[in-house]
Amino acid sequence: MNQQTVNVIGAGLAGSEAAWQLAKRGIQVKLYEMRPVRQTAAHHTDKFAELVCSNSLRSNTLANAVGVLKEEMRALDSAIIQSADKCSVPAGGALAVDRHEFAQSVTDLVKNHPNVTVLTEEVTEIPEGPTVIATGPLTSESLSQQLKELTGEEYLYFYDAAAPIVEKDSLDMEKVYLKSRYDKGEAAYLNCPMTEEEFDRFYEALTTAETVPLKEFEKEIFFEGCMPIEVMAKRGKKTMLFGPMKPVGLEDPKTGKRPYAVVQLRQDDAAGTLYNIVGFQTHLKWGDQKEVLKLIPGLENVDIVRYGVMHRNTFINSPSLLNPTYQFKQRNDLFFAGQMTGVEGYVESAASGLVAGINAAKLVLGQDLVTFPQETAIGSMAHYITTTNQKNFQPMNANFGLLKELPVKIKNKKERNEEYAKRAIETIQTISKTI
């Protein structure tokens, strides 16, 4: 066992994963988490890896880059993916979890490791010695100021938003049908079909509803993947009909016809009593939220157990500050991980924590750090956030477009993605034997 200690600040998805990767390599870890001593604007519990937005970790198939990313993480013994697999709920081809069971599983896994010491306190200064900063998009003001001084850069910032969660028992199941788009996987979504007239009425209410006002100094920059539904609506009706309310592949089994629009609800807990409204992240005032949602067929008497909220997200300019190892360029024993690096999404955040944890361990053990190759989803994300244009840096999800091009061009997209996936997994399996 190595006696040198690594500090990990933040026990979210990235911090928990980093702590796990360090601990399993025999490194002593001091894991700092300020909750519940000090809560954030979006968290509700003191559990590690609490999911504050959707309960879906997105696609679980190798036809999608985030599915490949998960498979790579399984090969590297990821605590986050291990817990997600254990706490999954039905979601078609996606990996969705019971958020409470999932957070408890991660907490137990990390907290109970003999090499991990948990300190429940707010970190206001960056500690000396090997450190992984994974404080997330809701980093406290005092630490944010420290980071600003350290980096010499102004933060970029944006908002993302959480969708409402509703009780299944309050839905009118006569108007709702169970189906997954194109009948892929098991039927896992509740679908609320709309006629054009119903959609127009809903659209009018949504675009005229009141939102919670933003502070004057705050500038609105939304990441496309978690854009508030009311902001999307103001871009035009078609934005919604080609977005979260897209009816394609969701024909109503009663009529055999495609509705004009569809609102989908996805199971949010293992018991199947709670559902979240897919793509309906919102910052509407709570009274307005309920009135707008009641216009969705089947939700006329809806009981909302958690209203949608919006919170500020903060991330650093990684292209100018980080190496692909997630190591800070100006201090080699300091690593960053999670959404604050500009990776976007639960799985991507955990993957960055995995890399930062592995490399912090390598540093302490006096070994060469690992730069994951661009042939892998993990490596392509690290490469993107550290080499893309500094001036226009924006968060990025895992996607096949980030991976290194195949040596032979394949025109068929499905076949091309299959080849990307095969190469990525073969590459990571080889790497996993050496780290």
UniProtKB/Swiss-Prot annotation:
Assigned keywords, A-Z: Cytoplasm, FAD, Flavoprotein, Methyltransferase, NAD, NADP, Transferase, tRNA processing
Keyword flag Methyltransferase: yes
One Gene Ontology cellular component annotation held by this UniProt entry: cytosol
Residues noted as binding FAD in the record, renumbered to the chain: 10-15
Subcellular location as annotated: Cytoplasm
GO biological processes: tRNA methylation; tRNA wobble uridine modification
Pfam families (alphabetical): GIDA
MF GO annotations: flavin adenine dinucleotide binding; tRNA (uracil(54)-C5)-methyltransferase activity, 5,10-methylenetetrahydrofolate-dependent
Cofactor(s) essential for the protein: FAD
Keyword Transcription regulation: no
Reactions that this protein is recorded to catalyse: uridine(54) in tRNA + (6R)-5,10-methylene-5,6,7,8-tetrahydrofolate + NADH + H(+) = 5-methyluridine(54) in tRNA + (6S)-5,6,7,8-tetrahydrofolate + NAD(+); uridine(54) in tRNA + (6R)-5,10-methylene-5,6,7,8-tetrahydrofolate + NADPH + H(+) = 5-methyluridine(54) in tRNA + (6S)-5,6,7,8-tetrahydrofolate + NADP(+)
EC annotation from Swiss-Prot or TrEMBL: 2.1.1.74
PANTHER family (alphabetical): GLUCOSE INHIBITED DIVISION PROTEIN A (PTHR11806), METHYLENETETRAHYDROFOLATE--TRNA-(URACIL-5-)-METHYLTRANSFERASE TRMFO (PTHR11806:SF2)
Family according to the record: Belongs to the MnmG family. TrmFO subfamily.
NCBIfam families per record: gid_trmFO (TIGR00137), PRK05335.1 (NF003739)
Protein purpose: Catalyzes the folate-dependent formation of 5-methyl-uridine at position 54 (M-5-U54) in all tRNAs.
Name this polypeptide is given: Methylenetetrahydrofolate--tRNA-(uracil-5-)-methyltransferase TrmFO
Organism: Bacillus velezensis (strain DSM 23117 / BGSC 10A6 / LMG 26770 / FZB42) (Bacillus amyloliquefaciens subsp. plantarum)
Lineage: Bacteria, Bacillati, Bacillota, Bacilli, Bacillales
Gene that produces this protein: trmFO
